[in-house]
């Protein structure tokens, strides 16, 4: 059992024995010992600082392709979709996006601003945080090809900004400083890029033709 947490120190919502089936695309999974919905980045830092250092921490975006056992998750699950769900245009083709932003939402935003290549994000079923963690990609594009910088958080609640040179990035793999998690990133794109919402819709429709997006699904499965 997770050691007692001082609820008065945090502003977000702390749920106990939360069924993970409510938070995954597969609609299966036992209870998380604790699930925390932080109010914002500062509150997230306070939560981590007050959390016992022996308590495992897991991060949750939209729960795409996340399989949780019936026995649930021991430790703290942190759901970031709301607290880290902002997108901000910075100018000169740069866009900041929080780790909780759905990749499809990010794709549409960038295309509306005439920025690219960004339409490939529409083919990624998760959030920006997950895309950063594994260098997710689709339709020939990869997340880290567009990264200018990332904001990260450590277990002590400290926020830092890092650049791509501080990471080893490969196909569906990202290795960087230990004990840090992605809060979001600044992405760089070409302005007045030749793309359209129709292309984004076409990519989404291509996914729909291959996968039952409206039903609990594990997406594509490959046998090597």
Task: Describe each PLM feature range.
Residues 29, 37-41, 67-85, 133-163, ...:
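Structural signature of FAD isoalloxazine-binding scaffolds in flavoprotein oxidoreductases
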Residues 29-30, 48-51, 72, 81-82, ...:
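Surface-exposed beta-strand edges and their flanking turn/coil or helix-capping segments
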Residues 15-16, 22, 66, 153-224:
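Phosphate/pyrophosphate- and phosphate-bearing ligand-binding catalytic cores of soluble enzymes
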Residues 94, 98-100, 147, 156, ...:
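Structured catalytic cores of enzymes that bind and process phosphorylated ligands/cofactors
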Residues 2-128:
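Anion-binding (especially nucleotide phosphate/pyrophosphate-binding) glycine-rich loop
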Residues 27, 96-98, 119, 133, ...:
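Conserved beta-strand segments that form the floor/walls of ligand-binding pockets within enzyme
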Residues 25-26, 59, 103, 120, ...:
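Bulky hydrophobic/aromatic packing residues
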Residues 107-113, 117-148, 217, 223:
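A gly/ser-rich beta-alpha-beta helix-loop segment of oxidoreductase catalytic cores
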């Amino acid at each position: 059992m997770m050691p007692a947490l001082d609820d008065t120190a945090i502003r977000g919502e702390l749920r106990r024995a939360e069924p993970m089936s409510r938070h995954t695309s597969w609609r299966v999974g036992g209870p998380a010992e604790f699930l925390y919905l932080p109010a914002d980045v500062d509150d997230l830092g306070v939560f981590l600082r007050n959390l016992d250092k022996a308590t495992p921490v897991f991060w949750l975006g939209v729960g795409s392709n996340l399989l949780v056992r019936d026995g649930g998750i021991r430790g703290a699950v942190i759901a970031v979709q709301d607290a880290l769900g902002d997108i901000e245009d910075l100018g000169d083709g740069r866009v900041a996006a929080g780790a909780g932003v759905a990749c499809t939402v990010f794709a549409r935003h960038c295309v509306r601003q005439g920025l690219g290549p960004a339409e490939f994000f529409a083919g990624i079923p998760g959030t920006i945080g997950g895309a950063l963690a594994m260098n997710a990609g689709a339709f020939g594009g990869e997340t880290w090809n567009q990264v200018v910088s990332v904001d990260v958080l450590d277990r002590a609640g400290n926020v830092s900004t890092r650049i791509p040179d501080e990471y080893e990035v490969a196909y569906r793999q990202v290795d960087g400083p230990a004990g840090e998690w992605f809060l979001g990133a600044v992405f760089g794109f070409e302005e007045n890029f030749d793309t359209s919402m129709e292309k984004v819709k076409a990519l989404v429709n291509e996914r729909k033709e291959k996968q039952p997006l409206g039903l609990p699904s594990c997406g594509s499965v490959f046998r090597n």
